[in-house]
Amino acid sequence: MVDMMDTPVFTHSETAATETGKPAHAWITRLPEGLRTTEQGRLAGLTFAAKDNIDVAGVPTTVACAAFAYVPDRHAAVVARLLDAGATLLGKTNLDQFACGLNGTRSPYGAVPNSFDSRYVSGGSSSGSAYAVAAGEVDFALGTDTAGSGRVPAGLNNIVGLKPSKGLISARGVQPAARSVDCVSILAPTVARAVEVLEATLGHDAADPYSRELALHTTPLPAAFRFGVPAQPEFYGDALAAAAFEQAVQGLRAQGGVAVAVDFAPLTEAASLLYDSALVAERYEAVRDFFDAQADQVIEPVRSILQAGTRYSAADVYAAQHRLQALAQQAQAIWPGIDVLCVPTAPTHCTLEAMRADPVARNRELGCYTNFVNLLDYAALSVPASIRPDGLPFGITLIGPCGSDWQLAELGQRFHHATGLTQGATGRPLPPARPIAALQPRPGTHLALAVVGAHLSGLPLNGQLIERGAVLE
């Protein structure tokens, strides 16, 4: 066990092999001794991984680009909170470079395959985190989610992907992809585990300009809740996905839900703005200095995505923002008639071969039902729904207004446990469902304390601070 005040020992190593014996490329950096600061706290005994765009003090943050890599001198806020809650960090995971992708193949550290069938993509950009959870290598993992990066790989690997309301978890110490819509996401085998992690990490952070003090909805959904589904769902010709979604709709009906067909036109157009308008300039802005100096160190098609961000004027950005605002207003008309949205997490699976043949088109398909969520300020939860006849997982995403995180979790757990699925790719049965307590955000005000003696991390009285919500900064 390594105390956070020591320099962590790390290695660059592979994860376990796939069923074909090929490496899974899920890890970029391993911490062989683990990193733990206390044996007390609500997450004591649990292990986790962090996507390699999230800072861990003394360990390189590569964002899957060696030329960009740096060694931070402090933990990201979310990592610090997890360590203070007793969790043990085992390493940092692979991702689509600069978190630009939804497929898990855009990394010089190797493509991460699907945990069920290595011929298929894992989904991304939180590919390594999803694989590590699905394979049972960690108890949970951190990802990020700008356009679906925490949901798509969850849906494709039979695990839970919790995309919280924007600003609910601090993004301080996270290398941004598009700062105004970035979220830290949680990947876990069960909804209860994901919520347990969320409880340990949520709360306003005055040092993060995009952190927010949110009023979280704690009233359960009605017994006969209304769930919106796309009036004309798109599966890109994947009949197995279409059948799996219909099965999931029946599963929600069995939980008391009433399906309501929803016009997705404003959501679909909003999704297109993320890459097909001047909003893509925010991705370029996130790495502008590096990209202007070393664009040749960025792999394709990430390089082309970032390059596209250089072509717009400030007027173009405003025009895109105005259009997004108009679409957000149109989308508001959906909510009086429903309590929650339900969509396929991904409309189809894609082979590694097909992704390499046409990486832009295939990636765009995977984001069909995810790209609009952060732009419209929604919360989302991807939960496993079934295993298709071809052996590949299918997941659905429950979407609600900002602050509906607990409501989504409560419904998501009921739905997930009714499926009879196992945990990820491990074959282990789901543990018994347990009540999910209403989420209580940390208060925004805090008292700064200098701590000495037995209250330091790893010492006997540190638990007294942790029990009162203290966070080491």
Which residues are covered by each model-predicted region?
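Glycine-rich, small-residue loops and helix-cap segments
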Residues: 84, 201, 312-445, 455-456
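Short Gly/aromatic-enriched secondary-structure transition segments
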Residues: 62-69, 461-473
